[in-house]
Amino acid sequence: MTRRKLLVVALLTAACGFPQGRPALPAKPKLVVAIVIDQFRYDYLTRFRANYSGGIAELLDRGAVFTNARYRQFPTVTAVGHSIFLSGAMPSLSGIIDNQWFDRGLNRQVTSVSDEATQLLGGAGPGSSPRRLLASTLGDEMKAASRGNCRVIGISLKDRAAILPSGHAADGAYWFDPRAGAFVSSTFYFKELPEWVRGFNASRPAEGYGNAQWTPLAASPDYPDFRKKMPGGGPELYVALEASPYANEIVEAFAERAIDAERLGGHAAADMLAVSFSANDYVGHQMGPDSAEVRDMALRVDRSIGKLLAFLDRRLGPGRVVVVLTADHGVAPLPEVLAERKMPGGRQPAKVVLDAIQGALSGRFGEGRWVAGASTAGAYLNRELIASK
């Protein structure tokens, strides 16, 4: 979905009925804003449409809506969806095959963005990077086309959702660390956090939601009422915020700060900002797509996106920004809800499945570490042990 304000001048000029010179072309956009709502099913656009009044409503009303635009990738998880979004590369080409998997070369589990050659900035431990991404992204191509004279920034709660869409040549990717209650980055991008990031973190935005009461934004006879109180502060609050609308509000506020500090839209070539709202995914996994909480998250992220679009209009003016909105994947109903509908299914913890594989192979071929690792797709078997038998 893209904002359509760029067409207005050309259409008005073409409508004039008297001869004149070649009409002036509309000004080129100065900023591309690529927005992902994590785990946002397409039917949320129509199911909750009557209650949208912010950014989603604006994009639906004034943008182009592509009802059948999708990639048929597997697995449908955050890392894969975010890597495809601005690269167009399927997992077999991008190298991003899951959120995490077993790397046979390293003989251990890795994540899509883990990188022990880097350090976390703003927190403790190894950093993250796009080094496992084998494809270029839109941001990389914009950097190449402008000979480096543009800015590319990625922002999200999750490291992979900030890093993978923004690509290799990004000027920075930032994500929220619940251990620190702050936005962090990696030495892959720079030696220390920019001053504006340190200033934002110093304001301790997460603490402002201590003891906040999350209640439905709009009542509905189809959904039950709920009340959820946030912890008072500290790490307990930071973790709880991730599965609440307040996390998206913090991400939006950080995006506004990035636009000003990085002068996005103020360079000779068009800049790019990739923003992923991840809190919807955390709530969806906990509560399921049929829940009142998921509905409320949709209505509230609509407001957050609307706030961001209004900020962009004030800073850059109408028609100078191209906005794209998509999701990285959807979600199936909770097994318990399916059971109520007399549908087959259920829950089976991954450990139970892996232990069953391990036990079956040990019983048939003898003791040994038969299962070397795992991913969403299944188990990785120990090839060396198999060869030795």
Question: How would you label these PLM feature ranges?
Answer:
Residues 18-64:
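Active-site-proximal N-terminal segment of extracellular/periplasmic enzymes that hydrolyze or transfer
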Residues 37, 51, 68, 77, ...:
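Secreted, luminal/periplasmic, and some membrane-associated catalytic domains
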Residues 10-19:
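Hydrophobic h-region of N-terminal signal peptides that target proteins for export
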Residues 170-254:
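Long, well-ordered, tryptophan-enriched scaffold segments
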Residues 163-172, 231-239, 243, 266-301, ...:
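Active-site His/acidic residue clusters
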Residues 29-41, 59-60, 85, 142, ...:
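Beta-strand elements within well-structured catalytic alpha/beta cores of enzymes
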